[in-house]
Amino acid sequence: MRTNPTTSDPAVSIREKNNLGRIAQIIGPVLDVAFPPGKMPNIYNALVVKGRDTLGQEINVTCEVQQLLGNNRVRAVAMSATEGLKRGMDVVDMGNPLSVPVGGATLGRIFNVLGEPVDNLGPVDTSTTSPIHKSAPAFIQLDTKLSIFETGIKVVDLLAPYRRGGKIGLFGGAGVGKTSLIMELINNIAKAHGGVSVFGGVGERTREGNDLYKEMKESGVINELNLAESKVALVYGQMNEPPGARMRVGLTALTMAEYFRDVNKQDVLLFIDNIFRFVQAGSEVSALLGRMPSAVGYQPTLSTEMGTLQERITSTKKGSITSIQAVYVPADDLTDPAPATTFAHLDATTVLSRGLAAKGIYPAVDPLDSTSTMLQPRIVGEEHYETAQQVKQTLQRYKELQDIIAILGLDELSEEDRLTVARARKIERFLSQPFFVAEVFTGSPGKYVGLAETIRGFKLILSGEFDSLPEQAFYLVGNIDEATAKATNLEMESKLKK
């Protein structure tokens, strides 16, 4: 641990102590820097360019060494805009990789990729920093216990339960509710588990980052009056930032989460929104560095970069990092190399469906496409497993019958199939749920549903106990008791209309 050279003003003594180079070439966010013979920086070292532009404005650009070119030159990628830089400017080799603040002082704050606070709340009250590049925990340090992480979201807990200390992927195209689901998870986990979260906004919209921050302040996840009581640290590298920043912001968030796990011995939640943008930024940097592209134009090092990040997200004997990663699926194609590479690292996948979103069923989690390695009788128990399998079988049969219904109509089905369809439609609606973070849009108060309540509700629907209730009663409710109360209200309303 050391004082952060990239976020504090380097004094003259540091400047003299460190190696000094000069900019030889600038191509967009990529800089070639010449150093004196024998004074070459290491790969991943931080370089700082300081000076003034033609208007006299101060320049302070941090870069990261990516390649050693020979002839005493290195190629570095800038972490911020390179406007105003010119050839011949001094470049200081800081002698270490980028280091960022870590610990309790980061809670309730917003940081950029360099660990600099960007929320106008003054400097971070800590001198403890940690480098963003480090090795994954040794095999002997890993913890392999299997336990469920309850989220309070019915469709997730029943059909694709999350593993404590596991990696979960949220797959979906644009506008189907990935970020809303992440916000709900942060809210539920902070309130139900009292856990600390780190949110890495990787290459997403600045407006969404701002909305998320405001939502967190309103819901109490961030306590403005006493930041130490906040439950989340935010790290943003948004769409408008250079590819270097977007490529490294995930590592900055992960470094903060690792400190809570390893030093504070806490269970941490790491949210990455969006892991596809991490791959996309890596692809841009790869092209800028002149590497030959691989399949579909992605970088040839795609698997290595993904593996380096994902292997650090793990549980050790000290604590756990449970990671929830939103994965944008280009053109809804799950075979695209970016989502396909991500799949290999995940314990559970929550796939969001445009079809369900179009029906107005939120969260639009596809119950048949979503999977989890935890859905085994020896882990979740026989009752949970059997209920989940029956729900899936009912929905699968309904899916198979939809073509027949579209052509011949519901009346042409057998009595048994008609009953299956009726129950499947109730199940489909009961899988929807009002979110706390969506209260302002829906007008319905959010609901947290425990796992036992969820299993009880679906068992009752499958048993046929509620065959007489209208399917509308099961839409956007919490537990099954709310559905029966809603059915009674609907019945009274229809009588009044008559």
Curated annotation (Swiss-Prot):
Entry keyword Coiled coil: no
Organism, scientific name: Raphanus sativus
Name of the molecule in the record: ATP synthase subunit beta, chloroplastic
Residues the record lists as Phosphoserine modifications: S13
GO molecular function, one term: ATP binding
Gene Ontology biological process terms in this record: proton motive force-driven mitochondrial ATP synthesis
Family in the record: Belongs to the ATPase alpha/beta chains family.
Gene: atpB
Complexes and interactors: F-type ATPases have 2 components, CF(1) - the catalytic core - and CF(0) - the membrane proton channel. CF(1) has five subunits: alpha(3), beta(3), gamma(1), delta(1), epsilon(1). CF(0) has four main subunits: a(1), b(1), b'(1) and c(9-12).
